[in-house]
Swiss-Prot record:
Catalyzes the reversible phosphorylation of S-methyl-5'-thioadenosine (MTA) to adenine and 5-methylthioribose-1-phosphate. Involved in the breakdown of MTA, a major by-product of polyamine biosynthesis. Responsible for the first step in the methionine salvage pathway after MTA has been generated from S-adenosylmethionine. Has broad substrate specificity with 6-aminopurine nucleosides as preferred substrates. It is an enzyme of class 2 (transferase). PROSITE patterns: PNP_MTAP_2 (PS01240). This is S-methyl-5'-thioadenosine phosphorylase. CDD domains: MTAP_SsMTAPII_like_MTIP. GO terms for cellular component: cytosol; nucleus. InterPro entries: MTAP, Nucleoside_phosphorylase_d, Nucleoside_phosphorylase_sf, Purine_phosphorylase-2_CS. Its EC number is 2.4.2.28. It is found in: Cytoplasm; Nucleus. Phosphate binds at S43, R86, H87, S119, A120, S225. One of its GO terms (biological process) is L-methionine salvage from methylthioadenosine. It comes from Cryptococcus neoformans var. neoformans serotype D (strain JEC21 / ATCC MYA-565) (Filobasidiella neoformans). It comes from the Eukaryota. Belongs to the PNP/MTAP phosphorylase family. MTAP subfamily.
Length: 331
């Protein structure tokens, strides 16, 4: 959190039933409309620039509706990208209430293989000033267990996904130099990499004691959104990279007032413009590298071996439900 815009066009729907519950299922994109890259916009970032609108897709997944309709837009090359606004089209969904399972499931179901997510963050380090960009490579989870953080809970299956490297290392490495180049051209904005993001529950900001504790733990930035988004992307076998924009210094600096919404909003406008420039500048390259298959080698197929429950005792209804995001559960 720390605070993308959509139109209409329904795609054809059918339904399937699980335990007497009927879910609408929407037809996949046509082959020439395959969407490989999804964008999730955070606070202040509600649309993308320099793209041609194609359609809006309204989907209801087995885990409910996404936080916004999915906007499908075309890059100058004709390649398609999908966009979801994490907190809703009008920023009406709190961090704890974001339907992350539906967001990730919807993007996977329409064909996405990689996600570029954006998030406003607070800085826990003096060198990460408001306006700076950060691509983290680690997460400290300080959420409270009230968010739905797995596709497998209650399904009669025990699944342990690999999460030692919570972001796609290859996609991070691919994106970082491109982001840095764009930021220098945009206005000499600083990019930090190799940082750790703390994800807190919210919606209140940190106490000063908490902020100081996160610094001692090795946290560099703090937000309210990366968990469970990153965990669910891993379970759906999607490459996931988070591009963060610093808006404030949280509450750790003695002699300064703790962060306020007013302070955050002052920086959001500039950060959002830079984020749109970054997205417009990297999406084609990300699409191309996904087409070439250079980023998914460590993730694709990994969940097949993460399930420790024997196939013959896995509930059929659960397998059918999970096949929405992991097709091999339909085998």
């Amino acid at each position: 959190m720390r605070l993308f815009h959509l139109s209409r066009h329904l795609i054809q729907s059918k339904t399937f039933s699980l335990n007497r519950i009927t879910f609408p299922v929407y037809s996949k994109m046509e082959n020439n409309e395959k969407v490989l890259v999804g964008c999730i916009g955070g606070s202040g970032l509600y649309h993308l620039d320099n793209l041609t609108f194609v359609k809006t897709v309204h989907i209801e997944t087995p885990w409910g509706k996404p936080s916004s309709p999915i906007n499908i837009s075309s890059l100058p090359s004709g390649a398609l990208v999908a966009f979801i606004s994490r907190h809703g089209s009008h920023h009406s969904i709190t961090p704890s209430e974001v339907p992350c399972r539906a967001n990730i499931a919807a993007l996977k179901h329409i064909g996405c293989e990689a996600i570029i997510a954006f998030s406003a963050v607070g800085s826990l380090r003096e060198e990460i000033a408001p306006g700076h960009f950060i691509i983290p490579d680690q997460i400290i989870d300080r959420t409270k267990g009230i968010r739905e953080d797995t596709f497998f809970r209650g399904e009669g299956l025990v699944v342990h996904s690999m999460f030692g490297e919570p972001f796609s290392q290859k996609l991070n490495a691919f994106v970082a130099p491109r982001v840095e180049k764009i930021l220098k051209e945009t206005g000499d904005v600083v990019l930090h990499t190799g940082k750790t993001v703390v994800c807190m529950e919210g919606p209140a900001f940190s106490t000063r004691a908490e902020s100081l504790m996160y610094r001692q733990w090795g946290g560099d930035i703090i937000n309210m959104s990366v968990i469970p988004e990153a965990k669910l992307a891993r379970e759906a076998e999607l490459d996931y990279t988070l591009i963060c924009t610093s808006t404030d210094f949280d509450a750790w600096r003695t002699g300064y007032d703790p962060v306020t919404v007013e302070e955050v909003v002052k920086v959001l406008h500039t950060n959002a413009g830079n984020s749109r420039a970054v997205a417009a500048g990297i999406l084609q390259d990300v699409h191309d590298v996904v087409v070439e298959g250079k980023t998914l080698t460590d993730i694709k197929g990994s969940m097949k071996f993460a399930c420790v429950t024997r196939k013959d005792i896995q509930p059929e209804a659960s397998r059918k439900k999970l096949s929405y995001i992991l097709p091999y559960f339909s085998d």
